[in-house]
A protein has these predicted regions:
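Active-site-adjacent structural elements in enzyme catalytic cores
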Residues: 1-209
Length: 209
């Protein structure tokens, strides 16, 4: 049965959340954009469950939600434009596609040697990463072909008891999904225009639409 917990966490609820994270279970949680579905990014068990829940093909690796602590452990880059984008828009609704550290578990990249990463401004997400001491899988909370959930109620209706915990009580600040920038092309390429506009990004570095 799915557990519903409100944020900010009370002490006993925080213990429940910590336990669920450590047991490699699946959570639905609010971000500054839409609701996310995730759990321990290093756990193949969690990834496999989320692929099954979302009915998503396994050749599409999940984006990760991180904090700056995890960025250099997960990704490799040597380009000041990436640093400029990070300084300008993180934490916030910008996802960057970067080269991955070759030592990462294979399920994170599906042999693509790349990662999509975002440092969310959501206090909920940042607290979950802190409690688990690992980055989170951070895919949108919807089954393939279904609308993306933007509330705890929508998550409950769409997923029933397929997720272990739903966190509610945090108001999103953006009405769009995150903007995705591929930093592996020249010039960088915008794969999805979302909460951060092409114009805003072009103020920092040249982007191909």
């Amino acid at each position: 049965m799915t557990v519903l917990i409100k944020y900010p966490f009370k002490y006993n609820n925080e213990s429940i959340v910590s336990g669920i994270l450590s047991e490699n279970q699946v959570l639905a949680f609010p971000t500054e954009t839409v609701y996310g579905l995730g759990g321990n990014a290093f756990s193949k068990e969690v990834a496999d469950r989320i692929y099954l829940i979302k009915q998503r093909p396994k050749n599409k690796p999940f984006p990760l939600l991180i904090t700056l602590k995890w960025l250099k452990k997960l990704c490799l880059w040597n380009d000041s434009r990436i640093d400029d984008l990070i300084e300008a828009f993180w934490p916030g609704p910008l996802t960057l596609i970067l080269n991955s550290n070759p030592d990462l578990p294979k399920h994170l990249t599906n042999n693509s040697r790349t990662l999509a990463v975002r440092f969310s401004s959501s206090a909920v997400v940042q607290r979950l990463i802190e409690l688990g001491d690992f980055p989170l899988i951070g895919t949108s909370a919807n089954r393939s072909g279904f609308p993306v959930c933007s509330s705890a109620e929508e998550v409950s209706n769409q997923f029933k008891d397929d997720v272990d915990i739903i966190i509610e009580g945090y108001n999103r600040t953006e009405n769009l999904a995150s903007t995705i920038v591929n930093c592996l092309t020249e010039p960088f390429n915008i794969l999805r225009q979302g909460a951060i506009s092409l114009k805003e990004i072009n103020h920092i570095c040249k982007i191909q639409e």
